[in-house]
Amino acid sequence: MLYKGDTLYLDWLEDGIAELVFDAPGSVNKLDTATVASLGEAIGVLEQQSDLKGLLLRSNKAAFIVGADITEFLSLFLVPEEQLSQWLHFANSVFNRLEDLPVPTIAAVNGYALGGGCECVLATDYRLATPDLRIGLPETKLGIMPGFGGSVRMPRMLGADSALEIIAAGKDVGADQALKIGLVDGVVKAEKLIEGAMAILRQAINGDLDWKAKRQPKLEPLKLSKIEATMSFTIAKGMVAQTAGKHYPAPITAVKTIEAAARFGREEALNLENKSFVPLAHTNEARALVGIFLNDQYVKGKAKKLTKDVETPKQAAVLGAGIMGGGIAYQSAWKGVPVIMKDINDKSLALGMTEAAKLLNKQLERGKIDGLKLAGVISTIHPTLDYAGFERVDVVVEAIVENPKVKKAVLAETEQKVRPDTVLASNTSTIPISELANALERPENFCGMHFFNPVHRMPLVEIIRGEKSSDETIAKVVAWASKMGKTPIVVNDCPGFFVNRVLFPYFAGFSQLLRDGADFRKIDKVMEKQFGWPMGPAYLLDVVGIDTAHHAQAVMAAGFPQRMQKDYRDAIDALFDANRFGQKNGLGFWHYKEDSKGKPKKEEDAAVDDLLAEVSQPKRDFSEEEIIARMMIPMVNEVVRCLEEGIIATPAEADMALVYGLGFPPFHGGAFRWLDTLGSAKYLDMAQQYQHLGPLYEVPEGLRNKARHNEPYYPPVEPARPVGDLKTA
């Protein structure tokens, strides 16, 4: 053994060839600060070996290196800029020394090589991969950019266009694409990986392969003509501006850095990467996006723990076809759980099957599946008008009309047709689960399972625990939701549960702004362009459906009369009374026409101003700051109340539900992350300016207490140790 660290070791293989093996405790390898330091020590040992002829890098895990240790990021990002810069210089010196070894090097890459894992293998001369490879640089999705030389080496290896596509979008690619663009030199079966890598290494040692020529372009300026450079970087900057926008500075920073570094050799280019990385790491956007990643891991880990002793349902059923029922049926079947889809009429069943077939055909058109796979999936969706086969069902989700009497009757009837251990769930969006459970003989086998539309796109499923729902019931539906590729978050029962309960105060803030004379067009523009929502409130109401929102608003008002009951007619009432139901009938706040692709395109409609004038004060202008404050304060206050009342368990789960269920702008990280970034004391000062607007603007007592000491909701993060300590971590 030449060297042994906690996460990697170095040993001789044969005749002057050494192997460096990543083998961290646990199931995956991560390129954390300790591993970077250990890698530097191992390379130091290699540099002393006069008889070294070649080096093989490999992993003892199912994945090569999944990336940097993101749990370290928040503390690393708190160290002063100069100190973070020093540590990056140290880390890059390690990869430079790997790249500069006086012998050929090869990485045998299996599974994932992401972020720092990808940057590590970019420093070797050759890369051989297995078919399950996923390789790329996802850093821009975390609000940063590659910091271990990825923005320098990848463009010089692949050319500017391919590298920019991966780096700016935070993409990873599979084995075939990696081979096509030159990111790997070959792909072999897993059992042949080491044998194949050794064969390439021997050829390089023997002079049959010119490894020095392979290495040289990575050390030099990027080979691009002036015209090529102008085209590549201009197109990339245009694409980034269109897709990422001003709220996500990392992608455009990465593109500009690669452009600026193109004319330099490795050392100067790495210095530019360092100078760009460090300021990004100190942005609120990076902290928020890293926070989302960590919260996502926490939520998934919680679901995994909850379901460890539960068998995933093998047969499901959906009550109610149509768009929602068809979407749930498709998602279940697509992920391998057969589903019976029951409705009371043929037309609805046909609509449900058409929805599922449409989604499968999109997969076919994109080349994700072939005709055989399509036929196989669709054959596992069984449409029916009766309860045939329900005795085999493990879980049933009801997705019928949002009417408590109808839901109770259908659920009670279904309970008599299934096994005593079958779980029943309702896809209701607002009706309390404990109320629906009153109609059942086995309420312990019942819970809520709130999907979001469109089902195939929206990652969140709210799992609602009723007063009598058993732990096993909750675990079974969490297991099914996870199997469907969704992110299940368990909440306790109340009107609207979590997501809709906090959404309707936001809509109430919108209605009050309109009542006071604000223009809905400006509100939409401010909330989209300035705050960052994917849709402004008027547009969102049109998509949800004005009729749906009108009904849900009444349910919420009955559930929380002290805050959500109103004594005036608002914009939603006015549009509902005028039969303007939004996108579904082409008229809402906006007027909708189909574009060339058959998708609804919104246009202005002067008629809506006359309707709104009946329920509004004369038009007046509001500042962007006031619009954002008046829209967000009711939502944030309600989010805090849900945490204080135990409706949602943690700030992490609340923020993920908002991001995944409502499209809360990820660069803010969720309501609690936004609140922490703003500071609870500053938030209280802002909210108190608007408390005259009513109970929705009154800050909950728990938040007031935090504001007295400006306490955050997330646990405070300590800065990482000084850079000298990090080097030897």
Curated annotation (Swiss-Prot):
Its EC number is 4.2.1.17, 5.1.2.3, 5.3.3.8, 1.1.1.35. It catalyses: a (3S)-3-hydroxyacyl-CoA + NAD(+) = a 3-oxoacyl-CoA + NADH + H(+); a (3S)-3-hydroxyacyl-CoA = a (2E)-enoyl-CoA + H2O; a 4-saturated-(3S)-3-hydroxyacyl-CoA = a (3E)-enoyl-CoA + H2O; (3S)-3-hydroxybutanoyl-CoA = (3R)-3-hydroxybutanoyl-CoA. Substrate binds at D296, N500, Y660. One of its GO terms (biological process) is fatty acid beta-oxidation. Pathway: Lipid metabolism; fatty acid beta-oxidation. The keyword Nucleotide-binding does not apply. It comes from the Bacteria. SUPFAM superfamilies: 6-phosphogluconate dehydrogenase C-terminal domain-like, ClpP/crotonase, NAD(P)-binding Rossmann-fold domains. The active site is at H450 (for 3-hydroxyacyl-coa dehydrogenase activity). Residues 708-729 are annotated as: Disordered. GO terms for molecular function: 3-hydroxybutyryl-CoA epimerase activity; delta(3)-delta(2)-enoyl-CoA isomerase activity; enoyl-CoA hydratase activity; long-chain-3-hydroxyacyl-CoA dehydrogenase activity; NAD+ binding. Coiled coil: none annotated. NAD(+) binds at M324, D343, I400, V401, E402, K407, S429, N453. Keywords: Fatty acid metabolism, Isomerase, Lipid degradation, Lipid metabolism, Lyase, Multifunctional enzyme, NAD, Oxidoreductase. Involved in the aerobic and anaerobic degradation of long-chain fatty acids via beta-oxidation cycle. Catalyzes the formation of 3-oxoacyl-CoA from enoyl-CoA via L-3-hydroxyacyl-CoA. It can also use D-3-hydroxyacyl-CoA and cis-3-enoyl-CoA as substrate. Heterotetramer of two alpha chains (FadB) and two beta chains (FadA). In the N-terminal section; belongs to the enoyl-CoA hydratase/isomerase family. In the C-terminal section; belongs to the 3-hydroxyacyl-CoA dehydrogenase family. This is Fatty acid oxidation complex subunit alpha. The gene is fadB.
